[in-house]
Amino acid sequence: MDKKIENDSSIVIASDTSDSGNGKSKIRLMKDKLLLSCVEGNVSVGAFEIIYIETMGHRNIVHLKDQDFHIYEKLDTFEQLLRAHGFLRVHKSYLVNMQHIRNINSYVMTLDNGVKVSVPKARYKEVKREYADLK
């Protein structure tokens, strides 16, 4: 197994993906860290580092400040694991870390990295309420 450690945060990458594709979950939560079996290799990421997760095609993209990771796992699985860590499903394709929301206005959420996420009209009140409760 090749290991690569990036000390600029708590991201650890190990390029052994021997357990991928065996039907087991590709995500594990240990305290406040996610252990992911990604396309890029096995990755350990602090939940607080994740800005948002988006579904694109059959994979999810875990967006951090300076890095993205691709993983074949249901967004529902991420939602169940991260709900207690301040994550909110704002759209069928987006799970957002509420600590990284800059503002919500006119059905658009702006995140710390400048990304704008549309909030469906049906979910807007709930999203605004959840965000207000966090503040």
Task: Indicate where each model-derived feature is located.
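Membrane-interface aromatic/basic loop that binds lipid-linked glycans or pyrophosphate carriers
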Residues: 4
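Conserved binding/recognition cores within well-folded domains
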Residues: 7-112, 116
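DNA major-groove recognition helices of helix-turn-helix
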Residues: 78, 126-127
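C-terminal output/interaction extensions
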Residues: 127-135
